[in-house]
Amino acid sequence: MTDRIARVERTTKESSITVELNLDGTGIVDVSTGVPFFDHMLTALGSHASFDLTVHAKGDIEIEAHHTVEDTSIVLGQALGQALGDKKGIRRFGDAFIPMDETLAHASVDVSGRPYCVHTGEPEHLLHSVIGGYPGVPYATVINRHVFESIALNARIALHVRVLYGRDQHHITEAEFKAVARALREAVEPDPRVTGVPSTKGSL
């Protein structure tokens, strides 16, 4: 299996993003987006997926975090898709249940080449909650869905994320990110019994 690494850069009038990703890493993570809670979530994602992940982002956070979070998620998805390459020899499917105190979240991944995202189960108060920002730039949890959609669509994977139950917005969001991390880790792992692309069609 060839090196599964990627480096993607994206610059717009709203942000400048660089992501470096190694799917066969050991969880070495260096993240700086200017949004402390998002840094915390991306660090959890890389660590629990055992990816080596570097994210450097500069955006118009003086307006709010939305553009930076959105654009970083797009570039992360692009890097994931690029690092996957021809997808030969991978498990393809992965899923994980992650508890965090009162919260339980679940994620399922299919490295299918058919981009899709389902995000469900978050309590309604997460539409209006913010985390952090005292000091620092706050993270509005309403963007959780958009983060996962952006990763899935740009990586060309099917990603389902659901919250089975929970109350605390921090616990819910963190459990979701960790569930996605563990599901991705399983899905992209090499399977010694798979010699080609894991599809009856012969391609993904």
From Swiss-Prot:
One of its GO terms (molecular function) is imidazoleglycerol-phosphate dehydratase activity. Belongs to the imidazoleglycerol-phosphate dehydratase family. It is found in: Cytoplasm. It catalyses: D-erythro-1-(imidazol-4-yl)glycerol 3-phosphate = 3-(imidazol-4-yl)-2-oxopropyl phosphate + H2O. This is Imidazoleglycerol-phosphate dehydratase. It is an enzyme of class 4 (lyase). It comes from the Bacteria. Its EC number is 4.2.1.19. The lineage of its organism: Bacteria, Bacillati, Actinomycetota, Actinomycetes, Mycobacteriales. GO terms for cellular component: cytoplasm. InterPro entries: IGPD_sf, ImidazoleglycerolP_deHydtase, ImidazoleglycerP_deHydtase_CS, Ribosomal_Su5_D2-typ_SF. One of its GO terms (biological process) is L-histidine biosynthetic process.
